Design a protein with these regions (language model features):
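Solvent-exposed interaction patches of small proteins and small membrane subunits
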Residues: 5-12, 34-40, 95, 99
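Extreme N-terminal tail/first-helix region
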Residues: 1-24, 164
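Acidic/histidine-rich alpha-helical segments that form the ligand environment
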Residues: 13-17, 24, 85-124, 141-144
Length: 179
């Protein structure tokens, strides 16, 4: 069972890392936010706007996984998808940065509402994803702020210190740009 200090630490990190990401993004001009890094690979090739849309999509998806784990014992998450986001990744560059930032704020607020409902014992519930394997709700939720850190680095043009542990494949590689 998750102890209160671990839960407080989780919420603090989720709030802090999202704040850092939003601060970084809000400093960009529209032109800077649409810049395509030419020497990057995978998700690092995306514009800052595409990064924002992706983070929002993943937040909605991870939250759907957490919700399913609350409903069912160790569910298979293969077909579980998050709800729609304001701006899908494929349309990100057609929208103002302010709309993407607002969606990132909205998505995090929705996640924090889910966390408020959780009992300490709920954090031990598990769910299994073909991409990541079996994780507890606490592990799924920790992945949010780690994901934020990864995209902070990518937007800044740095190599991320955080590398997700994929069991099978990598998400969103189908949407990378050809070099």
């Amino acid at each position: 069972m998750a102890v209160e200090s671990a839960i407080r630490d989780l919420v603090q990190k989720m709030t802090a890392e999202r704040g850092i990401l939003l601060g970084q993004i809000e400093k960009l001009s529209e032109k800077e936010a649409e810049y395509v890094p030419q020497d990057a690979q995978g998700e690092a090739q995306w514009t800052a706007k595409e990064q924002c849309a992706h983070v929002a999509e993943m937040e909605a998806g991870y939250r759907a996984w957490v919700e399913r784990a609350l409903e069912e014992d160790n569910p298979d998450l293969t077909d579980v998808r998050g709800g729609p986001v304001a701006v899908p990744l494929e349309q990100a560059n057609k929208h103002p940065l302010s709309r993407l930032v607002a969606e990132l704020r909205r998505q995090r607020n929705e996640t924090l509402k889910v966390i408020e409902r959780l009992r300490p014992i709920d954090y031990d519930r598990r769910a299994t994803s073909p991409m990541f394997g079996t994780l507890t709700i606490l592990q799924w939720l920790r992945s949010y702020y780690r994901h934020d850190r990864m995209h902070q680095a990518q937007i800044a043009g740095r190599k991320s210190e955080y590398k997700p542990h994929f069991i099978k494949g990598e998400p969103d590689q189908r949407r990378t740009k050809p070099l």
